[in-house]
Amino acid sequence: MSSLSVYHVSSPEIPNKVLTHFEDIASTLAEQGVRFDRWQAAAKIQPGASQEEVIGAYKEQIDKLMTERGYITVDVISLNSDHPQKAELRAKFLEEHRHGEDEVRFFVAGRGLFTLHIDDYVYAVLCEKNDLISVPAGTKHWFDMGENPHFVAIRLFNNPEGWVANFTGEDIAGRFPRLED
């Protein structure tokens, strides 16, 4: 089940609130300019699936988002616990960073913890299959796939180069809860 835990930056051990109802999660994130939506991930995709398989299975949804928001680049991150670079990828995504453009993720399998650092608050969004999250350009965030990743997410960008992170150098991500396997 998707959830949202909201923390003040000064108290990473205790959330101010925890939400599990879709409407509550979506409205709380919308107040911060973040889109959280439910889409139907109809095709059966397993972590480890190729980018071509995933894009082919979700072409209609991808085309809709690209047309709706003007995204020009799409890629897929598909990881399972056997991936040889899982530790390196986890470490990279766990560093707080921002992008010069919106970042959109549509989870078509598994789950991941997408954490946003906005002003004095941290919003930890547990995203699962069917969840779509769109983070505005410039929003500081990090992503945890857990020690044993199991997820497939379609990522859309306004940048032709795709995923380009500007790391903040802050260690805040290490102070907040991570995704437990």
From Swiss-Prot:
Ni(2+) binds at residues 97, 99, 103, 141. Pathway: Amino-acid biosynthesis; L-methionine biosynthesis via salvage pathway; L-methionine from S-methyl-5-thio-alpha-D-ribose 1-phosphate: step 5/6. SUPFAM superfamilies: RmlC-like cupins (SSF51182). Gene3D superfamilies: Jelly Rolls (2.60.120.10). The record marks 96 as: May play a role in metal incorporation in vivo. The keyword Iron-sulfur does not apply. Keywords: Amino-acid biosynthesis, Dioxygenase, Iron, Metal-binding, Methionine biosynthesis, Nickel, Oxidoreductase. Its cofactor is Fe(2+); Ni(2+). The record marks 102 as: May play a role in transmitting local conformational changes. One of its GO terms (molecular function) is acireductone dioxygenase [iron(II)-requiring] activity. Belongs to the acireductone dioxygenase (ARD) family. This is Acireductone dioxygenase. The gene is mtnD.
